[in-house]
Amino acid sequence: MSEISAQLVKELREITGAGMMDCKKALRESNGDKVMAIETLRKKGLASADRKANKVATEGVIVSYIHTGYKIGVLVEVNCETDFVARRNEFKDFAKDIAMQIAASPSVEYITFNDIPAEIIEKEKKIESMREDLKNKPEDIKQKIIEGRIRKNLELLVLYDQAYMRDQSINIETLVKLKISYFNENIKIRRFTKYILGN
């Protein structure tokens, strides 16, 4: 096994928020594979993240980001449980990353898939159900195919489904869970507004 570089440990720590020794151990266990190390850390820490997801998050920050060229601006509210966490630079940096992610994702309109209005999903369902390749399929298989296609078509609109700009191997939903584990309290991306010059 090759030596684990300090740079790799630093990258993993920035992504996951886990401690330096935990990152180093996870990288050793995964023979330096960053994706496998993230999975290892998730397995160790995300059980607590899932429990914490039900706690009320009323503290937090509102962060602004103006993209290069001054043509796109984003305001995002990211909540946590305590003002102690809200004041931490790591939390503010996470919120700034989310604002940058939104600015860099031109089609993102919703935080989670469940935030998409029912009428948009129904419209997609009608379009997909009229496709020729589904006409001779059994109804139960047809419904599963339609659901899969709707999910695929609409995932570009959902922030949680976007690959994280700093590490394409994880999406924003996974990043939020990793941050819940790191800060040891619930974290929520509550809302955002994107301004595009001329729109």
Curated annotation (Swiss-Prot):
InterPro entries named among the record's database cross-references: EF-Ts_dimer_sf, Transl_elong_EFTs/EF1B, Transl_elong_EFTs/EF1B_dimer, Transl_elong_Ts_CS, UBA-like_sf
Major localization listed first in the record, in broad terms: plastid
Pfam families with a match to the protein in the record: EF_TS
Disulfide bond annotation, renumbered to this chain: none
Membrane-spanning parts: none
Organism: Galdieria sulphuraria (Red alga)
Any GO CC annotation of this UniProt entry: chloroplast
Source domain of life: Eukaryota
Stated role: Associates with the EF-Tu.GDP complex and induces the exchange of GDP to GTP. It remains bound to the aminoacyl-tRNA.EF-Tu.GTP complex up to the GTP hydrolysis stage on the ribosome.
Protein name: Elongation factor Ts, chloroplastic
GO molecular function annotations of the record: translation elongation factor activity
Family, as annotated: Belongs to the EF-Ts family.
Keyword terms: Chloroplast, Elongation factor, Plastid, Protein biosynthesis
Database matches in NCBIfam families: tsf
Compartment(s) where it occurs, according to its Swiss-Prot or TrEMBL record: Plastid, Chloroplast
